[in-house]
Amino acid sequence: MKPIKKRFVPLVLCLPVAAALLSAPPVHAAHGAVVRVTLTSVWATPSPDPMGITYDPRTKRLLISDSEVDEMPGLWKGRNLFVVRRKGNLASSRTLKKFTVEPEDLAMDNRHRSLYVTDDDLDRVFKDKAGKDGLFGTRDDVAVTVLHTRRFGSFDPEGLTWLPQKKMLIVSDSTTRRIYKIRRGRDRKFGTRDDVIGSFGTYRYGFTTAEDVVATRFTHHLLIVSSRQRFILETTMKGALVRKIDLTGLGVKAASGITFAPGTDGSKSRLYLTDSGVDNNINPGENDGRLFELKIVP
């Protein structure tokens, strides 16, 4: 995660805008309820700042990335990819460091057994192809760059999701608070001149950061999380507001990643949310990462 730059604006202009933007969720909002909380900080190989998250349906495991652990000498064991059971137990810890030590987010392409990975230091999206072992984060992985996000104005790409039906990558930029939708052109390759790119902003809905994004399976609505706001923003693919899902009172400190996966309570689908807690730039010794399993209550 890139350090936050301080900006000073006249207070007389800032207060009315902030009041309007950061007000409570509207009447049509839903709220989240906790199903389970896991302390990623107490794993045998800890994840102090879990950031990215996706679900691997083939192994029925969550994959979680930590982009900050390499900055903590006391905790860094060369592992920044964590394979996790849905109940929160660590199955194994692996590494993506041969192509990134800053894996901000993950998105699964199960059909092609590939993992998309964002890096907000290099401003790239990588595609990591599993080798013969079928596993991610092992020696036989083959990783290539598929997007240089600066090409379309994203200098802080943090969130990522893959829509197989639309063959679309969606990137959330934490600094611009914009959601970028990228589709391949006629050459059927990402990162070339004929890519079709669209975007919309989230600041108008009260977000001051946009950490991650995931798409619903049937409606293709987008769920977006912020490390500073205590709600999940749901929009249409074009950016129209659907609702805000209130997270107040759940104990989430800094939402960093979001994905769907089967619930531990028998539900076909629950939200899994990573919480990076206190920023290691503020407290270099922090180790307070958590994983939330949530249900949405209308």
Where are the language model's segments positioned?
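Sequence/structural signature of beta-propeller domains
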Residues: 28-298
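Compositionally biased, low-complexity segments enriched in small residues
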Residues: 1-2, 36
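Bacterial N-terminal signal peptides
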Residues: 12-20
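Bacterial N-terminal signal peptides that target proteins for export
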Residues: 2-13
